[in-house]
Every structure is written in C-alpha cells, then in structure tokens.
Amino acid sequence: TRGVVMVFDLFTSNFYLLLSIWIAIPIITFFYLFFVTAPYGRHASTNWGPSMDARWGWIVMESPSVFLIGGLCIFFRANLSSVSLIFVLIYIFHYFHRTLIWPFIAEMDGKKMPVFVAFLAFVFNIFNVLFQCTWILFIANYENSWLTSFPFILGILIFVSGFYINVRSDYMLINLRKAKGPGYHIPRGF
C-alpha cells in the first residue's frame, strides 16, 4: 500500500510535466507510423514476435481501464466526492463495454494479435488510469454544485452521444460483416 501512495505522490507532484510527456508520445508515434506499419488488424504480422488470440489480447490490454481504476478508487475511496464518483462510474461503464462486451460480439474468431501490441496497450492503459485517478482523486476538487453546472451537463451529453455513436457503429459494422462476409466493407447511412 505504501508503494501505491508513493506512485500517486510522484504523479501528483509532477502531474503537468508527466502529462506533457504523455501528450508528446502520440505525436511522436503519429510520425513514426509513417515509416512503420503497426502489426494489428489487416496489417497483422509475425515480425513483431509471438501472437495471441485477438479477443483475449483485447480483453487483457483494456482490463486496467476497468479493474485498475476500480481498485484504486476503492483503495482511495476517502478521496472520492459525489462528482468524482460519477466521473469514475462513467469511465468504468464505457470501458466495461469496450473490455468485456465488445470483444465477444465482434468477429475475432481465429484472429491473432502480437503479444507485444497487447503489452504496449496494457501499459498505455495503466498510465491512462494513473492520470485519470491522479486528477480525479488528488488534484480536482469538484463541489456538488458542479452536478448542475453547464460544463458537467454538456460533458454528460457529449459522453452519452459519443457512447451511442460508438456502440451503434460497432453493431453496424458487425451486422455488415454478417451480411457480406469477412473483409472490409464501407457502411452506408447511420
């Protein structure tokens, strides 16, 4: 438990520096991927080491976004306000679907994923959870009046809209594959 507290002390005291580095990583990766093809999906490759079942790779790589954030919020529950609890529950709701529902409705039978890709995504999600928890549990101070504020209501509306679009799009693509078979198809309409 002391180690967990030390990690959050480090994150809290260096939050904006670490966040700046975290934001720089995808910018660097964006340019890097002009020269290297990521070995995932239709570009899957054995050049990146051993592979694993894509469904289980997905579940493993996304799992910190459900279980780690839940565990940390239980561990630091004294730091949770009503508003921050709502933020965490929304976050877990989204990632519960992405982690434990989507992989079982998506067509992934027989597909493989490099273990290295699953590992990198797993590490990414650990850091993402640490940033989210550091902000929600230690830095932000949301009073209950925030629940009726314009930014909160707008944020909830954006989340609900985005979640709906995301899930509906998933099901559209899944149904398109069922109707037209394997391969890549462009959906029409929404």
Predicted features, each with a name:
Residues 190:
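Active-site acidic catalytic loop and adjacent metal/ATP-binding pocket
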Residues 2-187:
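Membrane-anchoring alpha-helices and their flanking helix-loop junctions
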